UniProtKB/Swiss-Prot annotation:
Coiled coil, from the record: 209-247
Keyword Coiled coil listed: yes
Protein name per Swiss-Prot or TrEMBL: Lysine-rich coiled-coil protein 1
Compositionally biased region (Polar residues): 64-79
PANTHER family recorded: LYSINE-RICH COILED-COIL PROTEIN 1
Keyword line: Coiled coil
Positions with biased composition (Basic and acidic residues): 161-188, 218-227
Region (Disordered): 62-84, 144-256
Chain's gene name: Krcc1
Length: 256
């Protein structure tokens, strides 16, 4: 059945429109809502719970279908109107109050969950419809993907990973060669420093030894000169101590 989205100023206008449509279809609509409502309110009270959550979720539809609905007794129509959310339009509030009349009577006699009208179903299903549209769009996009395209993409990704792995393997030897060359340069520099230090040490040692040898040689030369002088002096003294016989002998033989 198609529901009209035409806004009504009152419930009476909506009811008259509904009766016309039913009569045009050859049906006899039930118009005993007010009498049934009065009888039901006399027998028991009803208190309608409104949900103030967003997206116009007016009723809790998560109850099992077989559960019996019982309502508190002390509730008036003014209290019900006071609990209507302020963010609903005026014509929606009117339709909500009129809907509560029908639902009160139906619940009182049948004790079954009351089906919601089109506007309330739209309010309750607002968030779910958005989620379902997004889910369907994602599923359709996933289903429209060509298997060959997806296989090609997977192959390209795999090839890219392999190439990245090769590049990393090529970069490792470069780093290793660079590190080994740096280590070689460092070792070479250290060896040069060791050789230089050793040469300097040897030079110092050679200089010290040479200086020592010079001192020793000089000391030996001085001592030898002293000994020569001493010998000459001794010889001279011995020559002066010759006897007269030796001097005469020298004169007679040598002629001096």
């Amino acid at each position: 059945m198609k529901h009209s989205n035409k806004p009504y100023d009152s419930f009476q206008d909506e009811l008259e429109d509904y009766i016309k449509v039913q009569k045009a279809r050859g049906l006899e609509p039930k118009t005993c809502f007010r009498r049934m409502r009065g009888e039901y309110l006399e027998s028991c009270g009803y208190r309608e719970e409104f949900d103030s959550r967003p997206r116009y979720r007016m009723f809790d539809q998560r109850l099992p279908s077989g559960t019996n609905h019982s309502y508190p007794r002390s509730c008036s129509s003014s209290q019900t109107e006071d609990r209507v959310p302020q963010w609903l339009p005026a014509h929606d509030k009117i339709r909500l109050n009129s809907l509560s009349y029908c639902q009160f009577t139906r619940d009182g006699f049948s004790e079954k969950p009351v089906p919601l009208n089109l506007s309330q179903q739209e309010y309750n299903c607002g968030s779910y419809s958005v989620e379902s549209v997004v889910h369907k769009r994602l599923c359709s996009e996933h289903s429209t993907i060509d298997p060959q395209v997806s296989h090609r993409q997977m192959h390209q990704k795999r090839k890219k990973h392999v190439e990245e792995g090769r590049e990393k393997q090529e970069e490792r030897p470069k780093h290793e060669r660079k590190r080994s060359s740096e280590e070689m340069d460092l070792n070479k520099h250290r060896s040069i420093q060791r050789k230089k230090t050793k040469a300097e040490t040897e030079t110092v040692q050679d200089g010290t030894e040479k200086l020592k040898n010079r001192k020793e040689k000089k000391t030996r030369d001085v001592s030898s000169k002293k000994e020569d002088r001493k010998r000459r002096k001794e010889k001279k003294e011995q020559g002066e101590e010759r006897t007269e016989e030796e001097m005469l002998w020298d004169q007679s033989i040598l002629g001096f």
